[in-house]
């Protein structure tokens, strides 16, 4: 049986988060192995170091999120200050998957996965190199200071540009995601998240990981730059938005420099820039990988809708962002920029952002603005998260690198290396470069010959072979017909289902799906609905009716986004619509085959299928799908009238909405209420949904409409003040756009700063001199009880005389507090031993215990010296020395 370790690093904030209904238990059960709960401090330690992920590590109590944990310096221990009611229900999740337990065995009913057939070849192939030779160079400018980031952020980049290309050229900017920042060139196991890197460690060159795509684009006439964001990665764990605003500011600082260098300041540009053609700042494409995807999306929003307050960038916007490419992106805020076209890569074997939450860059744009901008999703069968960046790829990277698709207890039938469905690193990077180039051709060159590769038309780019890349889209020249809502009617084998709900009867199902990813603090999101189809005999029709008749005039085809379970055989449906005169018109049949999947994948993804629309349909009142198979299930995401080509995208004057962070001192007594402001720009009617907790810590979601002239919503947060010491407490607020609004800062909070002095700590020996087999003990006493755990960590120091070794103490105790085996015997001060001790809230004392064991070896007196330092609060500490006499 695999053992886990119980170590932790203290955080400084208690997060008070929405809780879902749970039955009360008379006595809270104990947490599972690997967990430790001391009052309001929760810690979990992985069996081995876990490189930082873009998705982050979250602690959950059943279905209630407690918050995002912070990693320790050794990348093994994760900590959160929160108060679980049921420690036995604690879970570690990242992008929806469990990290603290072995994954379940695949269900016996899940069919064997098969590689999808190659799609027909498209007329255009953007993966072919262009006519230009390329040049490569780098620049390093003075670092910048950003709010919330203590250390300056580097302004480093690699430039790949075409040689001898005439005139100004479109600019493509790449931003990498969250990765470890430093590594040792002599010890492959030594990595870290510091910035700047300490002595002996080297910065990871993540920004050099997109050279293959940059070289392809440069050969086709685009100037490209890939920027470094190590300074953001090392510090974004302390920010409320996981670094989205900081990444946006970094991008905009670089764009400002490029705008300067394209104009009067060209003579002072770095050599790598001067050797490139001037950039055409009216044609900019942003490419973001992982958290970099969320960062460039925020940069697009900040460029169209300037952010309030100090974001570290205040200059004019001298560029036009024509599109975003988002590679395996995070979107914690569910806040896409609806008026900037986008293409989102969804890697089928993503082991980091494994819930494929980037789907929200498509789905969450519906109904928010005019719907003219194309938003495309590309499902890449067999692609993982890391290999789009060569500096995160084993065998290519300068620093240590790994396959992010975790191996699990048994090989995955789809994603294990060597399977027919898994791409190699080179295949994945080639496919990625090809579809980035397709996006550049479409958004920057307005070359619509590549549009069928991105808009669900079911064709492929030969340069990306053998990759299977499927696409669907919203926006462009589409007219919404069925976009499920609470007003939608469904009958027959169909029902309206909630994408986000704690009610199994109302929910769309428990299967992992990119379309069902929920907003972080939401127990329900009423605006997010789908149509669930389930039939037990061929011909059981599903009928779906929008709230009002919809005109399909001018549309050439009806496009449906339809998902069937992973590995399902080809599932055929006869499609018809009913017009306002009651006439049913048969449109033809569509067929959808399940994507290759296992229980570990988010493969319930909607594929786009189309049927011709005859002339004269006019207004349609109902959509009917009649399955031809004997039984089955499907999920209809939406249906649109479709015509080929794009329509002009004129950004709407959307109101920008931002949740703010309000900081207050706690106070001394009574029930206190403070407001968290949610600010809004714009003068039209704007609708958003808020998420927060009420006075009983019950989750609240509220639909809010801001009328013309209204620019603020106050969210009341109530707490009880006292004179006992405790950590500062964060009460979060979330906001999601519903109509005529774009969200900048999706997360705000009331930060209640504790203003009480910490209790005084005294330490007294209980048994600091024992014989072998005895237990060394010290008692820690506080001058008064606190509201929160009083936490310290102790490290062993060499005592200067005979020192206790790993075999002089209890082996299980040593393993639980170090993660190391006791053999071979070695001094305690040479190990990773950490003794964490917490005085729980409401109590005033606790003992530190070091259990020793007897042995047959004749020894003199041995000692252990422990140095304790406060983690919460900081600034306290002490040293103790224990003596152990030989039993012989």
PLM segments and residue spans:
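Active-site-adjacent alpha-helix of alpha/beta-hydrolase-fold enzymes
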Residues: 340-416, 425
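Extracellular carbohydrate recognition and processing domains
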Residues: 582-619, 629-632, 708-709
């Amino acid at each position: 049986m695999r053992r886990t370790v119980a170590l932790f690093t203290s955080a400084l904030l208690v997060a008070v988060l929405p809780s879902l209904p749970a039955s009360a238990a008379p006595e809270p059960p104990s947490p599972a192995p690997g967990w430790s709960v001391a009052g309001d401090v929760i810690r979990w330690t992985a069996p081995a170091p876990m490189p930082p992920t873009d998705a982050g590590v979250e602690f959950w109590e059943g279905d209630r999120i407690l918050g995002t944990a912070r990693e320790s310096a050794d990348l093994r221990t994760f900590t959160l200050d929160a108060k679980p009611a049921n420690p036995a229900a604690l879970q570690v999740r990242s992008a929806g998957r469990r990290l603290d337990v072995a994954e379940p065995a695949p269900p016996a009913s899940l069919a064997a996965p098969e590689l999808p057939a190659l799609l027909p070849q498209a007329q255009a192939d953007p993966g072919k190199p262009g006519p230009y030779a390329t040049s490569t160079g780098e620049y390093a400018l003075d670092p910048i200071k950003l709010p919330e980031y203590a250390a300056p952020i580097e302004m480093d980049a690699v430039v790949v540009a075409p040689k001898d290309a005439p005139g100004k050229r479109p600019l493509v900017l790449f931003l990498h995601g969250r990765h470890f920042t430093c590594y040792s060139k002599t010890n492959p196991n030594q990595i870290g998240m510091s910035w700047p890197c300490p002595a002996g460690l080297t910065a990871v060159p993540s920004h050099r990981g997109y050279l293959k795509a940059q070289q392809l684009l440069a050969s086709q006439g685009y100037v490209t730059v890939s920027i470094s964001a190590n300074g953001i990665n090392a510090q974004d764990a302390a920010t409320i938005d996981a670094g989205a605003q900081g990444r946006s500011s970094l991008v905009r600082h670089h764009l400002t420099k490029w705008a300067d260098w394209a104009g009067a300041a060209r003579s002072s540009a770095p050599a790598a820039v001067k050797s490139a053609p001037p950039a055409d700042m009216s044609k900019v494409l942003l490419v973001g990988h992982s958290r970099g995807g969320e960062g460039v999306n925020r940069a697009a929003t900040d460029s169209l809708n300037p952010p309030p307050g100090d974001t570290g960038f205040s200059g004019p916007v001298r560029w036009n962002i024509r599109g975003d490419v988002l590679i395996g992106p995070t979107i914690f805020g569910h806040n896409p920029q609806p008026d900037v076209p986008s293409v989102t890569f969804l890697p089928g074997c993503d082991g980091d952002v494994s819930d494929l939450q980037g789907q929200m860059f498509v789905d969450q744009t519906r109904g928010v603005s005019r719907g003219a901008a194309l938003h495309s999703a590309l499902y890449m069968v067999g692609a993982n998260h890391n290999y789009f960046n060569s500096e995160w790829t084993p065998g290519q990277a300068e620093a240590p690198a790994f396959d992010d698709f975790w191996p699990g207890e048994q090989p995955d039938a789809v994603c294990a290396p060597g399977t027919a469905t898994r791409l190699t690193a080179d295949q994945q990077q080639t496919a990625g470069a090809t579809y980035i180039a397709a996006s550049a051709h479409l958004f920057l060159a307005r070359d619509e010959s590549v549009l069928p590769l991105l808009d669900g038309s079911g064709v492929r780019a030969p340069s990306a072979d053998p990759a299977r890349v499927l696409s669907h889209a919203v926006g462009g020249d589409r007219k919404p017909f069925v976009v499920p809502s609470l007003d939608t009617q469904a009958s027959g084998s169909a029902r309206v289902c909630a994408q986000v709900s704690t009610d199994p009867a109302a929910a769309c199902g428990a299967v992992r799906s990119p379309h069902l990813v929920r907003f972080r603090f939401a127990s329900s999101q009423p605006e997010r609905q789908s149509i669930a189809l389930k039939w037990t005999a061929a011909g059981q029709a599903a009928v779906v009716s929008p709230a009002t008749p919809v005109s399909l005039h001018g549309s050439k085809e009806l496009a449906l986004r339809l998902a069937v379970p992973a590995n399902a055989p080809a599932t055929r449906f006869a499609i018809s619509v009913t017009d306002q005169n009651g006439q049913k018109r048969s449109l033809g049949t569509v067929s959808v085959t399940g994507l290759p999947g296992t229980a570990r994948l988010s493969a319930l993804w909607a594929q786009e299928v189309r049927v011709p629309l005859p002339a004269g349909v006019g207004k349609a009142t109902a959509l009917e799908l009649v399955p031809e198979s004997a039984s089955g299930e499907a999920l209809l995401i939406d249906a649109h009238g479709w015509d080929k080509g794009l329509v002009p995208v004129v950004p709407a004057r959307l109101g920008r909405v931002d949740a703010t962070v309000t900081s207050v001192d706690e106070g001394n007594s009574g029930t206190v209420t403070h407001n968290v402001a949610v600010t809004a720009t714009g003068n039209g009617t704007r609708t958003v949904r808020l998420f927060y907790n009420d006075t009983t810590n019950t989750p609240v979601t509220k639909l809010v409409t801001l009328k013309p002239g209204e620019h603020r919503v106050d969210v009341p947060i109530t707490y009880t003040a006292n004179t006992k010491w405790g950590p500062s407490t964060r009460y979060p607020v979330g906001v999601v756009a519903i109509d005529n609004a774009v969200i900048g800062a999706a997360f705000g909070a009331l930060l209640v700063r504790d203003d009480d002095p910490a209790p005084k700590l005294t330490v007294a020996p209980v048994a600091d001199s024992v014989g072998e087999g005895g237990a060394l003990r010290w008692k820690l006493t506080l001058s008064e009880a606190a509201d929160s755990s009083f936490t310290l960590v102790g490290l062993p120091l060499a005592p200067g005389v005979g020192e206790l070794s790993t075999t002089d103490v209890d082996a299980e105790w040593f393993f639980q507090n170090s993660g190391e085996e006791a053999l071979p015997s070695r001094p305690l001060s040479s190990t990773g031993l950490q003794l964490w001790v917490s005085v729980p809230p409401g109590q005033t004392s606790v003992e530190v215990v070091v259990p020793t064991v007897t042995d047959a070896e004749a020894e003199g007196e041995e000692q252990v010296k422990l140095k304790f330092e406060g983690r919460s609060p900081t600034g306290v500490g002490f040293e103790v020395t224990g003596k152990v006499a030989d039993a012989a």
